[in-house]
């Protein structure tokens, strides 16, 4: 059993275009009383729902999982037989790993780990 802790960060939904992304995020925001906001490549409803402006990884979208130490989480996942796609890695300015996707989809969703803020 691993000592690495994971918790849900957000659910990502693939939209076909920016207009659909904005409308989808706005509806989630309205239903759940969340604050909509624009990100670099997506539109958010609060922190829980991310709607991609164009289709991205995962047939249905992605699920982001927080962890305190992404490097340790990558090691943990690989030791347990899960492959990490380092070509998707995002780094903080200080060079520490901030996010990375796994190669495997689950239920049509890509999975990625994100360093907990």
Residue ranges and their predicted role:
Residues 14-16, 52-53, 68, 103:
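A structural detector for beta-sheet-dominated domains
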Residues 59-89:
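Mid-chain, well-packed structural core segment of small domains
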Residues 1-22, 58-65, 117:
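N-terminal beta-strand motif that seeds the catalytic metal site of vicinal oxygen chelate
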Residues 21, 74, 108-110:
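Internal amphipathic alpha-helical segments of the cytochrome P450 catalytic fold
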Residues 1-4, 26, 30-39, 48-52, ...:
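Vicinal oxygen chelate
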Residues 43-62:
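Short, intrinsically disordered low-complexity segments
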């Amino acid at each position: 059993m691993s000592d690495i802790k994971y918790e849900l960060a957000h659910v990502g939904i693939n939209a076909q275009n920016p207009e659909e992304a904005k409308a989808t995020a706005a509806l989630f925001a309205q239903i759940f009383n969340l604050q909509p906001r624009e990100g670099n490549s997506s539109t958010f409803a609060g922190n829980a729902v991310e709607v991609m402006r164009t289709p991205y990884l995962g047939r249905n979208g992605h699920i982001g999982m927080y962890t305190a130490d992404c490097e340790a989480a990558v090691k943990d996942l690989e030791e347990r037989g899960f492959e990490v796609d380092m070509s998707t890695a995002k780094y903080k300015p200080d060079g520490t790993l901030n996010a990375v996707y796994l190669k495997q989809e689950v239920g049509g969703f890509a999975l990625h780990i994100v360093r907990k803020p």
